């Protein structure tokens, strides 16, 4: 039974997205449907966590907009994600970057991999 589930999940996993890690700055193109119209909206920020794995994998992106911290959690394999681009590779030593929530200004930056 477990093999059947894994087989079905393997078929549905997206392979068109680039690989990224926690600490990277990513730009996500999100499909937004307003009535009959559909448009793309960009959301750029730092990946602060990746959870689960396989088909149910999610990741959380944090950005500061107009002085207010905004976090959005996206399912990695969801069709609402039209595109994902890694803007900057970050160098971190943690899997979850919750400490960035308490930092302000330059202290909230992640070092870049050279």
Curated annotation (Swiss-Prot):
GO terms for molecular function: structural constituent of ribosome. Coiled coil: none annotated. It comes from the Bacteria. It holds the Pfam family Ribosomal_L19. One of its GO terms (biological process) is translation. The keyword Transmembrane does not apply. One of its GO terms (cellular component) is cytosolic large ribosomal subunit. Keywords: Ribonucleoprotein, Ribosomal protein. InterPro entries: Ribosomal_bL19, Ribosomal_bL19_CS, Ribosomal_bL19_sf, Translation_prot_SH3-like_sf. This protein is located at the 30S-50S ribosomal subunit interface and may play a role in the structure and function of the aminoacyl-tRNA binding site. Belongs to the bacterial ribosomal protein bL19 family. This is Large ribosomal subunit protein bL19. It comes from Clostridium acetobutylicum (strain ATCC 824 / DSM 792 / JCM 1419 / IAM 19013 / LMG 5710 / NBRC 13948 / NRRL B-527 / VKM B-1787 / 2291 / W).
